[in-house]
From Swiss-Prot:
ATP binds at G148, G149, A150, G151, V152, G153, K154, T155. This is ATP synthase subunit beta. The gene is atpD. It comes from Vesicomyosocius okutanii subsp. Calyptogena okutanii (strain HA). Pfam families: ATP-synt_ab (PF00006), ATP-synt_ab_N (PF02874), ATP-synt_VA_C (PF22919). Belongs to the ATPase alpha/beta chains family.
Length: 459
């Protein structure tokens, strides 16, 4: 085991000098002898000096401290012993429940599966959320992004998806909290505990208060645990909240590592860093990883390099819109902006496809007519356009839905709507069967039968 010494400390980036015959390799884990802090080698600078990122706070460090080279990358526990536990970026337990006691450790840096190992999938994953199941259906073994600015409901949507999918799903799940609020991590833990699925979930947290090294690597820690379950032949769910913080952590350390910033101040390696993570999140012939990732959109700008880079890797994109949220429609999913590769008549069937396109068509027409209505009023529209507007407003309200995880805030019981009921409901509105119903009865309901029941009560 070779020993070096710290020569320079700049925030989370630390330079260590080793002897010429004991130089660490890139991504090797180093340990500071006095504090036990782990560092990860990023660059070899020459003059026998390596530059490393600290996987923890650098307070208490000083030049001249001894550092050992472990000779291997960061390794984390994998397997069933991680289920029901909360771990940090190094796989160390942070839930005061004793050691993990794992039989196997895996390194967090792994190559993506080979092409011949990949297994494409067309099987749909029902979420019970109407707007998602209809407009941007998820594939089992696919990658989904929840895009949204600050405060439009990414985490609440993520929680509802976890509740609906993880509870109905008999397999294992991994949740990686990347640079998000500690309170949300705590809420999530208790939500899982109350739902009795905690024994099927591994939790890995590197929250907002952590140094950038932790936030940069915690997604890889969670992904490594998911890959192990997949390679055992299981179908795994991987939830990442929030992928933007992964990019942001890379930006924080990039300048300290001496790289020139690129567009909007992001690191020049943004695309390759994102690719290295996303290409590993895939399904093979052994098992599948279905991944749902929250993506923060800075200043609601979808063309920002970080969300724009993420788009390229996803099978379905759920775009949460501030304009929809302002109307009081939750989940605030924009049905005209959200997309899915699965929305294909050969995969979802003709009826589902036609109803989804019909819903988008009527909402698009309403959007086009809004200016005319604002200037001239509804009376100037043709009868056909009046009918379209009326149906669009009903569709818009019917896209809202009370969530189980929001019951404590709204007081309304959550609703799970099957895909069959979702298609039947929107088809009834588009076919004119609901033309005589007032639009307010469609707001915050589950199935179309509930709308009919509400209307009778009001009558």
């Amino acid at each position: 085991m070779s020993i070096g010494k710290i020569t320079q400390i700049i925030g989370a980036v630390i330079d260590v000098e080793f002897s010429a015959d004991n130089m660490p390799k890139i991504y090797d884990a180093l340990k500071v002898l006095e504090t036990g802090l782990t560092l990860e080698v990023q660059q070899q600078l020459g003059d026998h000096i390596v530059r490393a990122i600290a996987m923890g706070g650098s307070e208490g460090l000083k030049r001249g401290l001894g550092v050992t080279n472990t000779g291997e990358p960061i390794k984390v526990p994998v397997g069933v012993k991680t289920l029901g536990r909360i771990m940090n970026v190094l796989g160390e337990p942070i839930d005061n429940a004793g050691e993990i006691g794992q039989e196997v450790d895996w390194t967090i840096h792994r190559s993506a599966p080979d092409y011949d190992e990949l297994a494409p999938t067309t099987e749909l994953l029902e979420t019970g959320i109407k707007v998602i199941d209809l407009i941007c259906p998820f594939a089992k073994g696919g990658k989904v992004g929840l895009f949204g600015g600050a405060g439009v409901g990414k985490t609440v949507n993520m929680m509802e998806l976890i509740r609906n999918i993880a509870i109905a799903h008999s397999g294992y799940s991994v949740f990686a909290g990347v640079g998000e609020r500690t309170r949300e991590g705590n809420d999530f833990y208790h939500e899982m505990k109350e739902s009795n699925v905690l024994n099927k979930v591994s939790l890995v947290y590197g929250q907002m208060n952590e140094p950038p090294g932790n936030r940069l690597r915690v997604a890889l820690t969670g992904l490594t645990m998911a890959e192990y379950f997949r390679d055992e032949g299981r179908d795994v769910l991987l939830f990442i909240d929030n992928i933007y913080r992964y990019t942001l952590a890379g930006t924080e350390v990039s300048a300290l590592l001496g790289r020139m910033p690129s567009a909007v101040g992001y690191q020049p390696t943004l695309a390759s860093e994102m690719g290295a993570l996303q290409e590993r999140i895939t399904s093979t012939k052994k098992g599948s990883i279905t991944s749902i990732q929250a993506v923060y959109v800075p200043a609601d700008d979808l063309t920002d390099p970080s969300p724009a880079t993420t788009f390229a890797h996803l099978d379905a994109t759920v775009v949460l819109s501030r304009q929809v949220a302002e109307l009081g429609i939750y989940p605030a999913v924009d049905p005209l902006d959200s997309t899915s590769r699965q929305l294909d008549p050969l995969i979802v069937g003709e009826e589902h496809y036609n109803v989804a396109r019909g819903v988008q068509g009527v909402l698009q027409r309403y959007k086009e007519l809004k200016d005319i209505i604002a200037i001239l009023g509804m009376d100037e529209l043709s009868e056909e356009d009046k009918r379209s507007v009326s149906r669009a407003r009903k569709v818009q309200r019917f896209l809202s839905q009370p969530f189980f995880v929001a019951e404590v805030f709204t007081g309304a019981p959550g609703k799970y709507v099957s895909l069959k009921d979702t298609i039947a409901g929107f088809k009834a509105i588009l076919d004119g069967e609901m033309d005589d119903f007032p639009e307010q009865v469609f707001y915050m309901t589950g199935s179309i039968d509930e709308v009919r029941g509400r209307s009778k009560e009001k009558a």
